Amino acid sequence: MLFNVGYSETVKLFDWDCLVFHDVDLLPEDDRNLYTCPDQPRHMSVAVDKFNYQLPYKGLFGGVSAISVQHFTLVNGFSNQYWGWGGEDDDMAKRLGSQKLNITRQCGPLSLVEVHRGLALIG
């Protein structure tokens, strides 16, 4: 639900065209990682150290994700049915798929992410 609140407040400040949803405990290992929105939604935290730099499952869209305001609006944002940790990102992946949007994935060194243990609240 806080992702939707963040969106609502952010679009009041400026006419943004790109949104990046970023878990606070994930830190990119390469500072050349560009926080931009391509033509399709992009999952940016593909290779997380916690998962041995492997994508845990195909439908993952959590951690760090970039999506255009147009696509976010098209899928009506994140579901407000989830409280606490987990589930909202998988639901978003399904929402994107239902609108025939394809999740793209950043690959190579730019996709490497480390979980900052001092910031992790769960897991």
Roles of regions detected by a PLM:
Residues F14, D39, Q70-N76:
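Structured loop/turn residues at beta-strand edges in well-structured enzyme cores
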Residues L13-E29:
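Short beta-strand-to-loop acidic/aromatic patch adjacent to the donor-nucleotide binding site
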Residues P28-Y53:
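Conserved donor-nucleotide/metal-binding helix-loop-beta segment in metal-dependent transferases, i.e.
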